[in-house]
Swiss-Prot record:
Gene coding for it: rplC
Residue ranges crossing the lipid bilayer per the database entry: none
HAMAP family for this protein: Ribosomal_uL3_B
Annotated disulfide bonds: none
Residue runs in coiled coils: none
SUPFAM superfamilies: Translation proteins
UniProt protein name: Large ribosomal subunit protein uL3
Oligomer status and interactors: Part of the 50S ribosomal subunit. Forms a cluster with proteins L14 and L19.
């Protein structure tokens, strides 16, 4: 597809594989399950104050769709998906899209740079060594209690508190993260797959958003 769009694409991380180049080099790739995104709403400056395309993907049982969402999907005459995502586009490009239409993986080209956004794997409650790569205390030489302790958390009576943002133990992972400037290695519209060089955030089966690179 020669026309460039600023909108993204919602896919599902399938896992990692590798492809071989013509000169025999092995390239690690992440496979993105790229089923067509169904357009549920077109937002315009006149009505909504900005231009955007709202999409859904996948399927959700009717029992799990609440009434407002069911009415929204019914109005657009699209099957209820597992969520709603929105992508800003230029006002002049809105005419290329219609409610009920589909966006396919061919909006991307081989060699194009993209940003991939996903939710990282959750690691649960972790200490500072795993969470922030702190250095461990001595294993011996008189140390018997503080092998993995973080050390001092502050000063003394002044300021008499722990500053916000102090690196401490806590929940690790399960946050939204973007990996930038990854290369599209292959686009297979018939099989619904996008192969992207390198790793992308999240576990296999998680939703990811693929967008044209913002810093390319």
């Amino acid at each position: 597809m020669t026309k460039k769009y600023s909108l993204g694409f919602v896919g599902r991380k399938a896992g990692m594989s590798r492809v071989f180049t013509e000169d025999g080099r092995s390239v690690p790739v992440t496979l993105i399950e790229a089923t067509p995104n169904r357009i549920a709403q077109i937002k315009t400056v006149e009505v909504d104050g900005y231009s955007a395309v709202q999409v859904t993907v996948g399927a959700r049982r009717a029992a799990l769709v609440n009434k407002p969402a069911a009415g929204h999907f019914a109005k657009a005459k699209v099957e209820a998906g597992r969520g709603l995502w929105e992508f800003r586009v230029e006002d002049a490009q809105l005419g290329d899209f219609a409610v009920g239409g589909e966006i396919k993986a061919d909006i991307f080209e081989v060699g194009q740079k993209v940003d991939v956004q996903g939710v990282t794997k959750g690691k649960g409650f972790q200490g500072t060594i795993k969470r922030y790569n702190f250095r461990m205390g001595d294993a011996t030489h008189g140390n018997s209690l503080s092998h993995r302790a973080p050390g001092s958390l502050g000063q003394r009576q002044t300021p008499g508190r722990v500053f916000p943002g102090k690196k401490m133990s806590g929940h690790m992972g399960a946050v939204q993260q973007s990996t930038q400037n990854l290369e599209v290695v292959k686009v297979d519209v018939e099989r619904g797959l996008i192969a992207i060089r390198g790793a992308v955030p999240g576990a296999a089966g998680g939703d990811v958003i693929v967008r044209p690179a913002s810093k390319a």
